[in-house]
Amino acid sequence: MQGVESRPVLALMVTLNREAQVPFVGADVDGCEALTWIANESSKPGRVRDTQCWVAHSTDVYAASVLSRAAMDTRVGTAAHEDWLADATSRMSEALLDVLRAGESANATGSESTDDKLPLEITYSRAHRWGAAFPTSIAKGAESKQYLQSGDVYAVGDWCAEPNARGAVTSGLAAATAIAQALNARAKL
């Protein structure tokens, strides 16, 4: 894993004052400078429904610009780091609210206006730097598995194929196929 180049992302977690009336529980976000993906954590099975938690990931470009502004003088625990993190949290939170409010407006019918509800607001938010979020090799069309030169070992996971559960499964299946083929080839000797 040390040889895998990755790109950072900022991850955001918020709680809302009420349920967002949007027709999705997760979405890729297009046309937003700050966000690329959002999901309703509260919609997962077994989650407490009285708290509305959403998570979001920043775009690569936004993360790069924010992290370059942070420079190296913002070590965790310092006032400079907390100021930088508060600014990133605020900007990403506003972008998330914009997306959710637009979703509510688009989802509203004539009889159910969003004007009748409390305005959608964030009650808690926190951003986090996810330093090695997504491998750059995925963007370059990486193999779905990686053979490690140290021996008969395959490294698998979402970092090899796609940054999600489907990528992890695809990667594991590709390694299993390669191992089965190697065993079959040895058996024929």
Model-derived segments and their meaning:
Residues 1-33:
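Central helical "cap/lid" subdomain
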Residues 10-12, 34-36, 52-54, 151-152:
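A generic secondary-structure signal marking the coil-to-beta-strand transition
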Residues 10-15, 46-49, 188:
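Low-complexity, flexible helical/coil segments
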Residues 18-24, 44-49, 62-65:
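Short helix-loop capping/hinge motifs at secondary-structure junctions, enriched
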Residues 32-45:
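Short, solvent-exposed beta-alpha or beta-beta edge segments that form flexible loop/patches at the rim
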Residues 49-189:
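Conserved flavin/dinucleotide-binding core of flavoenzymes
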